[in-house]
């Protein structure tokens, strides 16, 4: 089965072709970072218009790269939510039109399920069950994953996501957009322990997160350093990253203890952070745990994860293959609400 995946939930347009027999055949991505940089963040209207411009050329690109035609497509998977409503509608509209024209089934995919399953695209995918740490610009969650469509929420952020905290800290430090990678790069030059920042909810006794207080602590420090030198900024960035990593690692280890699982999957844009990976890998070796990550190319939003998640859902529950076109979008959507019929 050849599945076309379409991702358009925010500021990246991604398309991919995944074959259930041969694996990932092709993927293409257009990032809108340059367009949004002048605004310091994503402008929803501009994002939607750019998706419209990019989606069909990217479709032709992946077909050419895979040596396939539109008539070879057996099913279409698209990001149904969560995300920006206008951006989601672009992908959904293209999926509906193509599905109708080609008379092939389509399936709406939860954006976070795509991230959660993206490590399964690697050469050594994790077997079920496992704990997943989803850390991105808009979400920070710990999930227990028992199988395709069988997910249980263990904990989540009560305010800012880790990625949001990175972006807001970047602005406080006068860094560019997107903020997450800029903060991480600056932190490489920082001296550990030069600043003391809180580890919110580190000892809360549950698996929830909170990063708003950490952001406020960074703001307080920047105000004290009115004439901040570059080394001070690097030291503060290092303190911030260390605080984030400490909390993410501690909560992940607690989730593994609570569930009894020995496998941890880390996905989402923040999952590309070097310090986070090094800490988790070190603990994995010490505690005989297996830690899995997606390829770096698939940490951020992409069409490959949507094509793969759609293919897995259709294989697990063929009744999801519908030709009832006119699918809408779900800008707000809890991952735990998408159980397959067989997992209900």
Curated annotation (Swiss-Prot):
Cofactor binding, note field: Binds 1 Fe(2+) ion per subunit.
GO molecular function ontology, one term from the record: iron ion binding
CDD domains from the UniProt entry: ASKHA_NBD_TsaD_bac
Residues that coordinate or bind substrate: 134-138, 167, 180, 273
Compartment list: Cytoplasm
Disulfide bonds: none
EC code(s) of this entry: 2.3.1.234
Gene Ontology CC terms, in alphabetical order: cytoplasm
Catalytic activity, reaction form: L-threonylcarbamoyladenylate + adenosine(37) in tRNA = N(6)-L-threonylcarbamoyladenosine(37) in tRNA + AMP + H(+)
Class of this enzyme: transferase
Primary localisation category: cytoplasm
Cofactors, names only: Fe(2+)
Binding site for Fe cation: 111, 115, 301
Biological processes per GO annotation: tRNA threonylcarbamoyladenosine modification
UniProt-listed Pfam families: TsaD
Keywords recorded for this protein, A-Z: Acyltransferase, Cytoplasm, Iron, Metal-binding, Transferase, tRNA processing
Role, per record: Required for the formation of a threonylcarbamoyl group on adenosine at position 37 (t(6)A37) in tRNAs that read codons beginning with adenine. Is involved in the transfer of the threonylcarbamoyl moiety of threonylcarbamoyl-AMP (TC-AMP) to the N6 group of A37, together with TsaE and TsaB. TsaD likely plays a direct catalytic role in this reaction.
Family classification: Belongs to the KAE1 / TsaD family.
Protein name in UniProt: tRNA N6-adenosine threonylcarbamoyltransferase
Organism: Cupriavidus taiwanensis (strain DSM 17343 / BCRC 17206 / CCUG 44338 / CIP 107171 / LMG 19424 / R1) (Ralstonia taiwanensis (strain LMG 19424))
